[in-house]
Amino acid sequence: MRRKIIAGNWKMNGDQDLVRRVAERAADSAGDAELAVCPPYPLLAAAASQLPFGVALGAQDVSEYDSGAYTGEVSASMLLEAGCRYVIVGHSERRTLYGEDNGRVAGKFVAARNAGLTPILCVGETLAERDAERTESVVGEQLDAVMDAVGGATFQGAVIAYEPVWAIGTGRTATPEQAQAVHAFIRQRVQERDAGEIADQLPILYGGSMKADNAAELLAQPDIDGGLIGGASLDPDSFLSIYNAAAEG
């Protein structure tokens, strides 16, 4: 059985006080699920020193380069040295706001994997792509770009997060059944291209506004193995409520 993962993506939010409050609440997170926190770069050191044992640290982005004259970039080896286990790559906001295409996302995935980090690859379709019935085409291309770059056993030891971009800030919501359908497609695509046993063990997280009041229903779906939590991860009580839903499921 796949172990569920609840990862908090703070985006460009948070401060030293939030690190302290989340660390205090995370001390109550004993359970079968894994808890991870991905704060902004300047808060990584504080989080690494304060998060209780068993709570993983992650970063929100990584450079595809190992070192060099790349002002503002942070390499995978630097994140590893800072105490990170996870790193998010290909988040919809990076793709949309900063023009990161599938090729660049694949490069970041490879860099993270080669350094010993666990990449959380984000995939998902926009509202226009959803309405044009291109969900599987778009998500498939995003997955294929990474599998083409890595070769065999691409997702061994990795994580995927499905972001229904069409249901974020659009007034439309994804039902648990709609989310499950895409998660099942992702697992099937990896099974076809990578390996069956890797696909069976691959954690696929839901990144579409999972909250305390809908977490249990989403996590009950057979191919939803946790959540990449945005806004709710900034509220320690809500974040731990989602974690508890995963740990008890």
UniProtKB/Swiss-Prot annotation:
Record's catalysed reaction(s): D-glyceraldehyde 3-phosphate = dihydroxyacetone phosphate
tRNA-binding is among the record's keywords: no
Catalytic residues of the enzyme: H91, E163
GO CC list: cytosol
SUPFAM superfamilies in UniProt: Triosephosphate isomerase (TIM)
Keyword annotations of the record: Cytoplasm, Gluconeogenesis, Glycolysis, Isomerase
GO annotation (BP), single: glycolytic process
Subcellular location: Cytoplasm
Matches recorded under Pfam families: TIM
Binding positions for substrate per the UniProt entry: N9, W10, K11, G169, S209, G230, G231
Matches recorded under InterPro entries: Aldolase_TIM, TIM_sf, TrioseP_Isoase_bac/euk, Triosephosphate_isomerase, Triosephosphate_isomerase_AS
Pathway the protein acts in: Carbohydrate biosynthesis; gluconeogenesis; Carbohydrate degradation; glycolysis; D-glyceraldehyde 3-phosphate from glycerone phosphate: step 1/1
One of the record's GO molecular function terms: triose-phosphate isomerase activity
EC number of the protein: 5.3.1.1
Predominant cellular place of this UniProt entry's protein: cytoplasm
Family statement: Belongs to the triosephosphate isomerase family.
Record's function text: Involved in the gluconeogenesis. Catalyzes stereospecifically the conversion of dihydroxyacetone phosphate (DHAP) to D-glyceraldehyde-3-phosphate (G3P).
Subunit relationships: Homodimer.
Protein name: Triosephosphate isomerase
Organism: Halorhodospira halophila (strain DSM 244 / SL1)
Gene: tpiA
